Amino acid sequence: MPINLASPGIVVKEVDLTVGRVDPTSGTVGGLVGPFTKGPVELPTVIANENDLLNTFGKPNSIDKQYETWLVASSFLAYGGALRVVRADDDNLYNGAVNTSGVSTTAAALKIKSVEHYEQLGYDDNTISNITVAARNPGSWSNGIRIGIIDGKADQCLGVSSIPATTSDWVGYGVTQAISATLPGVGSTTLLDGYLKGIITGVSTTGYSAAGDKYTTVQEGTLEIKVISHVSAGNTETPVEYQPNGVYRFTTGTATTTGHNGIQVMTNAGATVTSLGSTVHSSEDWFDKQVLYTSSGNPGVASTISTIQWSSIVDRPTTTEFATDRGAKNDELHVVIIDGEGKVSGNAGTILERHTGLSKAKDAEFSAGSPSYWRKYLKNNSSYIFGGGAPIGITTSGFSSGWTKQTDQAWDQDADGIIFGSSGTKNYKIVNGEDYKRNLNADGTVGVITTGGLTASVSKLATGYKLFENADNYAVDFLLMGSANHVKTEAQSLANQVIAVADIRKDALAFISPYRGAFLTDTSVGSVTVNSDETITNNVVGFYSPLTSSSYAVFDSGYKYMFDRFDNAFRYVPLNGDLAGLCVRTDITNFPWFSPAGTARGAILNAVKLTYNPSKSQRDLLYTNRINPVIFSPGSGIILFGDKTGLGRSSAFDRINVRRLFLYLENAISAAAKDQLFEFNDEITRTNFVNIVEPFLRDVQAKRGITDYVVICDETNNTAAVIDNNEFVADIFIKPARSINFIGLTFVATRTGVAFEEVIGNV
C-alpha cells in the first residue's frame, strides 16, 4: 500500500472485504391498470391496503361494472401484498375547475393527470391560463367541492345613503376623515390631529338603513374601505394599520377636517367628489361580515346555501412577515376547501382542508425551503386542488403616491415593494369534471357514448401497462389483468398486452382471467345468468387458445362471487388478483419455490362461491390447455387446483414454482453481480463471485428449492476473447425442485401365505 508521505506521518486507510453478497428478494408487489373514479392518471401509485385504495382512487362503482377492477385490486391486497395502481387515461377525462371569472370552466379546457403532469405542463412556475382553481386530478369526483378564498380587501364597511349610479366609479378613490384623539404613551400622551386616509375597494347597492339595525337593498349602499395612512396637520403621511377598536378607523358622525366635512371621497387627482357627512349611517368591521359557503346551492338564493363566518375559522388576513420585510403589503390570503355535497366525506359542509397564512408573492416562504406562495403551497399540501392564478376583478388596495392608484398590483410575482391587489371573499364551486365516456352494453359491447362512463378502452389500458415495461423504473413482481368485462377479442388483446410486458421485463408474472361473457349473461335490467358448465368450459378453452405461450403468464379458470361492502351487494369478480395474491402469501409463509396451489397454500379469500366449479373431466381439459382450475373442495373450501404457467410446451418452466424459483435466483444473483462491474476479470474476481453465489444456492437447497447446483466461473468460460471484450461470464446450473401434480396410489391384495418380497415390484 503506497503511503505517499514526504515527511514523517501516519496514513490511515480502510479496506472493506465484506462487500459482495447475495441478498434475498421478496416478491410481493403487484401492478394493475384500470378505470377509477379519482386519483392520478397514468402514474403508478403504491397502495399498501384497501384503505389506501379507497382514499386514493375512490370507491368501487357499479357503472360499467367498474367494481371488477377495484375488487381485483382489493382481493390482491388481502393476501398481504402491495400494489402499484395506474388509473387509465381517456380522451374525455377532464378536471373540474373554476375559471378566473368565478364560473365553472368547460371540461375540455383542462386536463392535469397528476402532480408530475402539472410540473411537465409548466404550471409549477407559470399560472394556468383563465383558471383560478382546478381539481387535483380528472373526474366528476370533484364536482360540488366548494373553495373559499379570502384576503384583506377591506377593513371596514360604511353604510351610506348615496352612491354613484355606476358603482365601479368610486373604486380606487380615496376617503378621508378628520381625527382628533389622544394616544397614550409611556408616562405621557400624544395629541393626534390631521386626518385618516383610506381607499375605496368596493361599492355595492346593499347596505344598512338609517336606523343602523336592519339590512336592506332599497336606496342604500355600502362602501368597502381599506385604511392606508394617517396624515398630520403638518401634512406628514405615516402608514398605519386598521384598528378595529382603536383610533385608526373610520367612524359615523360629522367630524371635520381642514376644508372638509365628515368623510370625504377623493378622486385620484386629489379633488373632492362629495362629503358624505351624516349620510354615513354605520361603520362595521369588513372581515366580521364575510361568510363562507359550506354547502352547494344557488348563490343567488340564500335559503339554498349554508354559511359560516370566516372570522370563526381563520384570523384576519393582513400582510405576511415575508412581505413586510420586503416592503410589500396585502399579500396574505386563506384558502378553505369544503365538501359541498358530501361526496368526499359523506357529510355536506365538512371542512376538508384549511390553508392559512398563504401569500400572493411568488417567492414567499414560511422558512427556507418551505414555500408559502399560495399556488406552490397548494401543489405541495392539498389533496384536492391546484391553484391556477388570481381571479379577475383584482381591486387596487393602495396608492403609489398621493391619491394615484397603485398599478403594479398583480398576484403571482415576487414580493419586493409590491402592494398586492385584493379580491376580497370568493366562494367557488368546482363543476364540469368529467369521467370516462365509453359506456358498455350489458353484453360487454361498446354502447352509446355518453357522459359518466367508467370503462377505459383497451388501447388506454395497454398504454398504462407499458409504464411497467422498464424494470428499472418500477419494481413489480406480478401484473394483474384486472377487470375482464370486455368482449372476447378485446379481452384477448388486453391479455396479450399484459403478457408482453411480463415477457419484456423477465422478472414478473402476468395473471390472466377469461372474459366475463364466458361465464355470465348480463341483461339490460341488471339480472345475471350463469352459463352451463359445458358452455363455460368451451368458452374458457377457446379464450386461452390463441394467447401467447409464455412461462411468465398464469391463466385461471374464472370468476368468484364475493361481497361488496361499499354497495351492500354481491359481485362476480375475476380471480387474477387472487392467484397473484396466493403467490404473495406463499412468499410470506414459505418461499417462492413452493407451489401456491393445493389445500395447504391455495385457499382463495373472500369467496362465497364460484361461477364455475369444473368436474374432473373438465379439469383435465383445462389443465392440458395451460389453464389452472379453481375449484370448491368440501372441507377445504375454494382452492387453486393447478400450478401451470402459460407455456405451451413441456418444460421445467411450465410450473409456477419453477418459474418463480428462477425469478428469485436471477433477481438476487444479478443484483450481486453488479458489484463485479468495472472490476478486473481475473482469478480473484471470479473466485470472489463464486464464493458469493455458492453459499446463497446452498441456503436455497437447504430450504428445498433446488436439489443440486454447480457454479462455473473460471478460465474455461472466461476465455481470453471474453476478457478482451470486457465481459464476465458465469454459468449456473440448477436442478429445480418439482411440485407434485399427480399422485398414484396402488392397493394390492395378496393371499395369506404369500411373502411380500415375492410380489413387490411385480405389480
Task: Spell out what each predicted region is.
Residues G139, N235, S370, Q492-S493:
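Serine-centered coil/turn micro-motif
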Residues G96-A97, A109-V115, S142-I150, L196-I200, ...:
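Short amphipathic beta-strand/extended segments with alternating polar/hydrophobic composition
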Residues I150-D155, A348-G357, Q492-A502:
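Short linear, low-complexity motifs centered on an aromatic residue
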Residues V160, T182-L183, T205-G212, V231-P239, ...:
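Surface-exposed intrinsically disordered loops and tails
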